[in-house]
A protein has these predicted regions:
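Beta-strand-connecting loop/turn residues
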Residues: 5-7, 126, 146, 214-217
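Core beta-strand-centered patch of the WYL/Sm-like small regulatory domain
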Residues: 66-188
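Non-catalytic surface loops within mature trypsin-like serine protease
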Residues: 13, 147, 155, 191-193, ...
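Polybasic (Lys/Arg-rich)
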Residues: 169-252
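Bulky hydrophobic/aromatic content
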Residues: 11-103
């Protein structure tokens, strides 16, 4: 409570400081997973966590671009359904889609439903993924949440608990470039020394590396051999080259 001519009440302390809220706003702005409409709604709610003056400062800095934002408004419903299914130990089913050349949604598997046992939601490379057990394939798989339609929980108990408990999600994410599956293989990469940071960022600080000569290093890592891995290599082809095993060299 304040005294004097302008007596009244003021908030002595706030849970969030302006830099903290600004960080959250930046994350919402840059997230491809969150639609433009939802981004503006969330930022409006975040502005309520700071004073009116600080909120005005945020508003002057906020620009929500449509570029690379998803258009699937059902994502938030999907996340809620998945969380509930995990908590209730239930399976889920959904349609999965890709975009065609006309930028239209095209259902995968000829429109058949996917039915899986959900175990984890994870964030990777600016996208949200469901990690789930596919009983037909007998293994864990991953699915982009923004590519799901018609998602619902199924009154069947989840399967694959042993597979999930044996799973190292951090290692799994590192090996599955772009979160597309492929055969797991240990590869050896010949890299410019300037690529040391790139290798650590991609494979983690525990990646095996050693000097090769004055300008190169050798790195060994387990990866999921897939078009996404080869695409990553192609983007760095003048600096990083796969040299073994021969099967991967020949496939690339």
């Amino acid at each position: 409570r304040t005294e004097g001519a302008h007596a009244g009440y003021r908030i002595a302390d706030r849970t969030f400081e302006l830099p903290e809220v600004k960080l959250l706003v930046d994350l919402v702005q840059s997230s491809k997973f969150i639609t433009t409409k939802k981004s503006r709604q969330l930022i409006g709610k975040l502005e309520q966590l700071v004073s009116k003056n600080d909120a005005k400062k945020l508003q002057r800095q906020v620009v929500v671009a449509d570029r690379n934002k998803t258009s699937n408004e059902k994502i938030y419903y999907s996340v809620d359904v998945i969380h509930s299914a995990i908590a209730e130990n239930r399976q889920t089913r959904f349609h999965n889609f890709d975009g065609n050349v006309r930028k239209e949604m095209q259902l995968r598997k000829n429109g058949r439903f996917y039915q899986v046992s959900p175990w984890l939601l994870t964030w990777d490379d600016e996208n949200y993924y469901l990690v789930a057990y596919d009983a037909d394939a007998g293994k864990m798989k991953h699915y982009r949440v923004d590519k799901m339609l018609d998602l619902s929980a199924v009154d069947q108990a989840r399967r694959g608990q042993t597979d999930y408990e044996q799973m190292d999600i951090a290692s799994y994410s590192r090996k599955n470039f772009g979160m597309f599956a492929g055969e797991e293989t240990t590869v050896q990469l010949l890299c410019d020394t300037s690529m040391t940071g790139v290798i650590i960022d991609r494979f983690g600080a525990s990646v095996a590396m050693r000097p090769y000569d004055e300008t190169h290093i050798l790195a060994r890592a387990q990866v999921a051999v897939s078009p996404q891995f080869f695409g990553w290599l192609a983007g760095l082809s003048t600096h990083i080259r796969v040299i073994s095993p021969d099967s991967v060299v020949n496939e690339y």
